[in-house]
Amino acid sequence: MKYKKTMGCILGGLLLSAFLYWQDNGLMLTRMNYEGDIPKAFQGYKILQVSDLQNKVFGKKQKPLLKKIKESAPDMIVITGDLLDRHEGRTNVDSAMELIQEIMGIAPVYFVSGNHEHQSGEWDVLLDKLIDAGVTVLDNGKSIIEKDGDTITLIGLADKSVNPYYHEMLHTLMAGQEERFNILLSHRPELFDTYVEENIDLVFTGHAHGGQIIIPFLRQGVFAPHQGFFPKYTEGMHEKDGTVMVVSRGLGNSSFPFRIFNRPELIEVTLSAK
């Protein structure tokens, strides 16, 4: 009897370990479709979102992650912050750049910072390396994307932790862009009402880590930074007054070491005209 109990505990421990490993490492490519007033040339245009890697490594030289990105075959790759992890002993700029150097050959890459970049003490180092690699860093900036004579505006906000006047900054960046289809990259989903107020068409965000633990069947996250317990914006698409916000569950972990019913994800959004 004692032997059976011991073996049962061992088996249970192994199954739990396997489950937690799969939850943390079982990469997903989540495909979404956005319908809106898309310029004709951008019909079918694919945007691949990478968020909240937090210095996590998926196999040797990020091969499983790269395989998923290549599978998407995107027209554009957007990174919405927290490529680095701020915690002592985990911040590794060179490791983060390993992924960047590989994806530069897949599609143009656009980046905005998250709170971890600025809290790591390595932001200036990472910024220089991103620019040297050919990444377009859009912290409080914008870029006009042209395709076959049509254009869209891509806007980026630096993280709120170093950008306290983010609303005023976004208002300034949007000036003169009202008639052009616009996309915003921002780390923070909890600022959704600000994005709505500025009439952004499509927003890509992260930061919430999917609520870390998702309650099955309810699809309710338990906790997200700057939203607290049972947060509203942790994953998926959210729409309000014509603004659509995409929230990535992200790829890595930080303060809390596990994901439960919340596998790491890349997001692919295909643009479609109504």
Name each region found by the language model.
Residues 1-41:
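N-terminal membrane-anchoring alpha-helices
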Residues 30-36, 173-185, 244, 251, ...:
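Extended recognition/assembly regions associated with phosphoester-bond processing machinery
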Residues 35-48, 135, 143-155, 177-180, ...:
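Beta-strand-turn-beta hairpins that frame and shape the catalytic cleft
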Residues 45-138:
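Membrane-embedded segments
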Residues 50-55, 81-83, 115-117, 141-142, ...:
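Active-site metal-binding loops of divalent metal-dependent hydrolases
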Residues 75-77, 82, 180-183, 201:
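Conserved acidic residues
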Residues 121, 128, 132-135, 147-186, ...:
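Binuclear metal-dependent hydrolase catalytic cores centered on His/Asp/Glu-rich metal-binding motifs
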Residues 189-267:
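Conserved beta-sheet core of the metallophosphoesterase superfamily
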